[in-house]
């Protein structure tokens, strides 16, 4: 999630540490340079390319040494598996095969015209060898976001910027704009790579396609890239915005082009020309990496299916500039009439496209057409013939019949063949645009329905809440008024009286009266304490007297008890005396008897 947020906040930069090891180090440098950093990219010159074999060996060793320090080594039978090297090696092998094929197909030429063509071909081969050594900037961050264009109309905002970006040959609408000279040679290699990508594998097409797109960076200075970074951000968003717009009517931008139309940037005129081989072999239109990436991503299904989305005319975005289909100056009035009749008869949507793009070219600038025609060039060259000698002979025959001094063009027949095949997929015209627009309408209706249901359900609650809020606001206002009145009363009345009561200078003040009463109470308390001391002494005396009285009472009780006891004995004293007397008398009688008995017995 952090990576996604960082990518949305910084769409022009990429963390190179997260890229797979198969990407070379120059990939990240190109990204930083396109974002306006101080990293400078060397401009490509007309220097020979090193041999592919040493480059491949060097790339393998460097790639293995770099990746082995970060990744675990995978071995099969104790032999390390070296990862697939950079696509630069594949491009080198592709270039070598192309050189060998051109040498085999090149006929024996002797005159000046043939030598000129041979020289141009060799120059194109050298230029392609320089252009295929770098990888382009590829990433979803260069295509903008769908949410930036769905609910806003930026036609008025685009007019000023577009007119400024195309106002001169030196002004760049994005960091990847290159000069006409550089674009002339780069487009030659691009056409060849696209044709080989259809015959070869998908990886070969990706390598060639990406290498050509990134080479455009090397044709511009770092200061120009920094000054036009904002325009490039606009350009990438404009691509997605115009692709998602539903088509109006039956207009198709590619219906306005025909076989004899060649776009050539010039400082004096930006119209439709019939040029020599040097100009006809290229469609000199600057294309941004956003467009390249857009069609490159859509090419996955187009390689195996000729009726796929990429090859159908419904895929064509409606953003080609009208300057590519108009001419301000011409070398021949006959050619202009032929072009006009062909455009009006075969491609009826030219007027619509011109009216749609008229505000963008109101400044009267005579620059190259729009920068998003790489998809058109790819469609025109998707069925390029492999037999170059046949193309050469057919073009040479046409030039000889017309008596013109123009050199033969190796791509004119391919344009006518590809134009004839554009009608194969007419059933799919505007299918995807209509499908996307229909889905957007359905989504919008669903959103509106849900919004209305929610509003109807919650409207009563909102009204009740507002009423409660109004009542609470009124109560709070009344409470605030009461608090203000109370504060005024306290300040003006109670605080004044309180201050007067505690004024020490006033003898009649409450504080002074309180002091006097407290002093009097203290004096009374002191007198009470003295009286309490006297009472305590008296109490001690009374306690001693009470103790004596208690002892006397106890003695008296004992005497009373003894008296009571003596009284009971006194009552029975005569009885006791009688008993004692009887006992004595009985004893005396017994004694007397004994005596008498003894006496008589003697």
Swiss-Prot record:
GO terms for biological process: cellular response to alkaline pH; cellular response to salt stress; post-translational protein targeting to membrane, translocation. The modification Phosphoserine is found at residues 167, 342. Residues 31-55, 83-108, 323-369, 399-419 are annotated as: Disordered. Residues 96-108 have a biased composition (Basic and acidic residues). Phosphorylated. Is dephosphorylated by calcineurin. Keywords: Endoplasmic reticulum, Membrane, Phosphoprotein, Transmembrane, Transmembrane helix. GO terms for cellular component: endoplasmic reticulum; endoplasmic reticulum membrane. The keyword Membrane applies. Residues 352-369, 399-408 have a biased composition (Polar residues). It is a single-pass membrane protein. Residues 323-333, 409-419 have a biased composition (Low complexity). The chain crosses the membrane at residues 575-595. Its main location: endoplasmic reticulum. The keyword Transmembrane applies. It is found in: Endoplasmic reticulum membrane. Calcineurin-dependent protein required for growth under high NaCl, alkaline pH and cell wall stress. Interacts with the 2 calcineurin A subunits CNA1 and CMP2, and with HPH2/FRT2. Present with 251 molecules/cell in log phase SD medium. This is Protein HPH1.
């Amino acid at each position: 999630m952090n990576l996604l947020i960082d990518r949305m906040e910084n769409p022009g930069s990429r963390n190179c540490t997260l890229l797979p090891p198969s990407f070379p180090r120059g990939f990240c440098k190109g990204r930083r340079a396109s974002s306006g950093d101080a990293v400078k990219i060397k401009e490509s010159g007309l220097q020979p390319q090193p041999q592919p074999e040493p480059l491949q060996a060097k790339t393998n060793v460097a790639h293995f040494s770099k990746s082995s320090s970060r990744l675990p080594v995978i071995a099969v039978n104790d032999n390390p598996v070296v990862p697939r090297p950079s696509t630069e090696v594949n491009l080198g092998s592709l270039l070598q095969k192309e050189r060998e094929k051109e040498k085999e197909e090149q006929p024996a030429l002797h005159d000046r015209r043939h030598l000129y063509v041979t020289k141009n071909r060799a120059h194109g081969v050298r230029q392609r060898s320089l252009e295929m050594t770098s990888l382009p900037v590829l990433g979803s961050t260069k295509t903008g976001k769908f949410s930036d264009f769905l609910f806003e109309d930026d036609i008025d905002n685009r007019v000023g910027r577009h007119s400024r970006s195309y106002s001169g040959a030196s002004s760049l609408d994005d960091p990847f704009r290159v000069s006409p000279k550089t674009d002339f040679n780069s487009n030659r290699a691009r056409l060849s790579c696209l044709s080989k990508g259809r015959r070869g594998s998908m990886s070969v097409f990706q390598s060639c396609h990406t290498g050509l797109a990134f080479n455009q960076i090397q044709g511009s200075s770092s200061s120009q890239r920094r000054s036009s970074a904002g325009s490039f951000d606009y350009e990438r968003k404009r691509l997605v915005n115009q692709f998602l717009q539903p088509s109006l009517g039956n207009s198709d931008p590619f219906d306005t082009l025909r076989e004899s139309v060649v776009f050539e940037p010039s400082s004096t005129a930006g119209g439709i020309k019939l040029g020599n081989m040097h100009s006809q072999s290229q469609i000199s239109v600057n294309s941004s990496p956003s467009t390249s990436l857009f069609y490159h991503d859509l090419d996955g299904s187009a390689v195996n299916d000729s009726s796929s989305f990429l090859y159908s005319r419904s895929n064509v975005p409606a953003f080609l500039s009208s300057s590519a289909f108009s001419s301000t100056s011409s070398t021949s009035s006959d050619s202009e009439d032929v072009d006009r009749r062909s455009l009006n008869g075969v491609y009826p949507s030219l007027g619509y496209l011109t009216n749609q793009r008229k505000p963008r070219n109101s400044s009267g600038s005579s620059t190259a057409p729009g920068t998003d025609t790489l998809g058109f060039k790819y469609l025109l060259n998707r069925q390029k013939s492999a037999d170059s000698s046949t193309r050469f002979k057919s073009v040479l025959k046409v030039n000889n019949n017309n008596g013109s001094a123009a050199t033969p063009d190796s791509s004119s027949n391919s344009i006518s063949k590809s134009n004839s095949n554009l009608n194969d997929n007419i059933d799919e015209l505007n299918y995807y645009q209509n499908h996307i627009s229909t889905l957007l309408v359905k989504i919008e209706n669903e959103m509106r329905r849900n919004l209305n249901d929610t509003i109807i359900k919650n409207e009563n609650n909102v009204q009740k809440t507002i009423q409660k809020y109004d009542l609470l606001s009124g109560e709070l206002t009344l409470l605030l008024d009461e608090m203000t009145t109370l504060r005024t009363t306290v300040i003006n009345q109670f605080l004044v009286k309180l201050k007067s009561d505690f004024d020490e200078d006033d003898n009649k003040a409450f504080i002074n009266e309180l002091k006097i009463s407290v002093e009097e109470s203290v004096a009374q308390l002191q007198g009470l304490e003295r009286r309490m001391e006297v009472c305590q002494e008296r109490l001690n005396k009374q306690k001693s007297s009470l103790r004596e009285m208690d002892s006397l009472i106890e003695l008296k009780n004992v005497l009373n008890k003894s008296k009571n006891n003596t009284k009971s004995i006194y009552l029975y004293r005569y009885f006791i005396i009688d008993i004692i007397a009887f006992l004595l008398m009985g004893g005396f009688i017994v004694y007397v008897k004994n005596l008498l008995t003894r006496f008589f017995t003697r």
